[in-house]
Amino acid sequence: MSIRPLHDRVIVKRKEVETKSAGGIVLTGSAAAKSTRGEIIAVGKGRILENGTVQPLDVKVGDIVIFNDGYGVKTEKIDNEEVLIMPESDILAIVEA
């Protein structure tokens, strides 16, 4: 299935978080926090400004990002994979190699 977000929305596939503590203890359940890093897998066309022009997004498909996992983030299952749909404003940073 193909999915295309609208306007300033992006679709992110969450990256797996390390499940071991610094001391080597395997974390489970609530002790294993969900990662706030992910890969952009789709982007909308951009934010519509008051004058009607479209401002392109700063992120692109393939970017690794750090995001705010909060109120505006919607979790969906696409082709048996969990993805996150969020506005670009919930992205805090792009991880550069």
Swiss-Prot record:
Keywords: Chaperone, Cytoplasm. It is found in: Cytoplasm. GO terms for molecular function: ATP binding; metal ion binding; protein folding chaperone; protein-folding chaperone binding; unfolded protein binding. It comes from the Bacteria. GO terms for cellular component: cytoplasm. Disulfide bonds: none annotated. HAMAP family: CH10. This is Co-chaperonin GroES. It comes from Klebsiella pneumoniae subsp. pneumoniae (strain ATCC 700721 / MGH 78578).
